[in-house]
A protein has these predicted regions:
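Beta-propeller domains
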Residues: 74-86
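Short loop/turn segments that connect beta-strands within beta-propeller blades
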Residues: 83-86, 123-126, 163-167, 209-211, ...
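Sec-dependent signal peptide recognition
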Residues: 2-9
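WD40 beta-propeller blade core
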Residues: 80, 120, 160, 205, ...
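C-terminal motif of bacterial Sec signal peptides marking the signal peptidase cleavage site
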Residues: 14-15
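Extracytoplasmic beta-rich repeat domains
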Residues: 24, 39-62, 91-106, 129-146, ...
């Protein structure tokens, strides 16, 4: 399964023409450059190296910010806290293990996951390691916490919920695992009364944080097509919670809005993405799998 996931991700990232139309030899014409008047001027405030990068590994380590601090990680296990205004290093911690998921932040905790399925939780104030815990498989997305629990989604489509103070497992959910999936997992949304996660099956599920009981579940997209490639409908982007509405998007499927309280579908449209949607000015924005931007 891991080999299939890795092969599929390489093909998708490289823009392989095997899946694109009837004429494999047809060259894709570059889009015409359009002159435009810039309305916003962007000035770089600072730039700081935070490690050696991901090299050739197919991972996406993203920094996260809380207040006046930015937290970042590199594949070699270096975790760095920076002043958001100046870029000055506040602390650095070296874990000496390959980090593949992160950086997550919640309630004073900085969290990362590793290629071997370890989860490390650090104190956001000084970078000291509070605890580490083992989950079922490699972690590719950022762990999330509400201060009481830490939620970790692993590449085998399982989700572990750990005690935020000790790292002990409280409960686990085993998601339906399709034969093929895009290499990646959804980040969870964690509140005081709900854990919201998307899965490779195209399902969006709301859990009770206390015991893992399912509050509701809805399928954002149904697999269609003859081949396993055509039937992939992974939710790999973090669901977006805006008030009482949840927005999410699948790969090769749909973007939609559902009720936070019931999971009832409010609307959906054809779309395809493995990134989280964004919200602004009364619209939902999706970065499409074919390098397009859609607004709904």
């Amino acid at each position: 399964m891991k080999k299939l996931n890795l092969l599929l991700c390489v093909l998708l990232v490289s823009g392989c023409s095997w899946f694109g139309g009837d004429d494999d030899d047809a060259a894709i014409e570059p889009a015409e450059l359009v002159d435009f008047q810039s309305e916003v001027s962007v000035v770089r405030q600072w730039s700081v190296s935070v490690g050696s990068g991901a090299k050739n590994y197919l991972i996406s380590l993203r920094p996260t910010a809380n207040g006046d601090t930015v937290f970042a990680a590199d594949y070699e296990g270096q975790i760095t806290a920076l002043d958001v205004g100046t870029g000055n290093v506040r602390w650095q911690t070296q874990l000496d293990v390959p980090v593949t998921g992160g950086v997550g932040y919640g309630a004073g905790l900085v969290m990362v996951g590793t290629v071997e399925g370890e989860v490390f939780t650090l104190d956001a104030d000084d970078g000291s390691v509070l605890w580490s815990s083992q989950v079922s498989s490699e972690v590719l997305s950022s762990p999330k916490s509400n201060g009481e629990i830490v939620v970790v989604h692993s590449i085998d489509n399982k989700m572990a919920v750990l005690d935020a103070k000790t790292g002990e497992e409280i409960w686990q959910h085993d998601g339906d695992a399709p034969i093929l999936s895009v290499r990646g997992t959804s980040e969870s949304v964690v509140t005081n009364n709900m854990v919201l996660s998307g899965f490779d099956s195209g399902k969006l599920i709301a859990f009770s944080p206390d015991n893992g009981s399912i509050i509701w579940e809805t399928r954002l997209a149904l697999p269609t097509g003859r081949t396993e490639l055509e039937r992939m409908v992974d939710i790999d982007g973090e669901p977006l919670l805006v008030g009482d509405v949840i927005y999410s998007v699948t790969y090769q499927g749909r973007v939609g809005a559902v009720s936070r309280g019931t999971g009832r579908s409010l609307w959906s449209q054809d779309s395809s993405s493995h990134h989280a949607p964004a919200h602004g000015d009364g619209q939902i924005y999706v970065t499409g799998a074919e390098d397009s931007v859609q607004a709904f």
